[in-house]
Amino acid sequence: MELAGRSVVLTGVGREGQVGEVVARAFADRGARVFLVDRMDDQVRARSDALLAAGLRSAALSADLSDAAAVDALAARVRDATSGRVHALVHLAGGFAASGPVAESDPAEWTRQFTINLTTAYLTARAFLPLLRATKGAMVFFGSEAALPGARVQGLAAYAAAKSALLTLVQVIAQEERDAGVRANALAPAAIRTAANVADMGADTAYVTREAVAEVVLWLCSDAARSVTGQVVRVR
């Protein structure tokens, strides 16, 4: 899969060892120019510098994706750097935390989970859609198996509800942007094998590899998936 000449924006890719690092490398290895976005400036610069050291095309941008003005400014910077043409947006920003039983939960945690998992996605999509229309590009969002029917979600009210709302947002975008040629899809991966997850959940948990997730993201952003939109793809 050749992606030379394409510009790809990836959010939430600052932390070393996480899936975003592998997804970004997969795009860059195939010739794409990647714009890495995270609120942690030093971390996202480290990820970008590693790609640059390998002779790949990368730029690091820091932004608070929960702030509408900051996201609009981010999109403007990318617009200026790409002549207004972005081919793919991969939104990995988010976070997981148990909120406990509903009757005992903290409303502040509910708000926090919706902010990091839903509001950031909405604001990022809103800001970058004009740039994606120019290329009939693709958007990929990271959902969760916790948002799917039959999932075991006890103690996860805030997280599961936020991710469920995210999947609905993806449906809305897919329907609204169909005529413009912009595609929107979501992944619902199983637990991803990272050092942090293994430490938290143990080595015997059934994991999906970061590389397997990256391959699905690449496909959804490629011309091979040009007729696929509004879908939730499970990765196990």
What are these regions (language model features)?
Residues 2-35:
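Canonical Rossmann dinucleotide-binding motif of NAD(H)/NADP(H)-dependent dehydrogenases/reductases
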Residues 179-182, 186-187, 202-236:
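C-terminal helical subdomain
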Residues 12, 138-165, 170-179, 191, ...:
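Catalytic loop of short-chain dehydrogenase/reductase
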Residues 42, 62-74, 107:
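The beta1-alpha1 cofactor-binding region of Rossmann-like NAD(H)/NADP(H)-dependent oxidoreductases
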Residues 92-99:
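Conserved NAD(P)H cofactor-binding loop of Rossmann-fold oxidoreductase domains
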Residues 100-102, 109-111:
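Substrate-binding pocket helix/loop in short-chain dehydrogenase/reductase
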Residues 125-126, 171:
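A short, exposed helix-loop element centered on a Lys and neighboring polar residues
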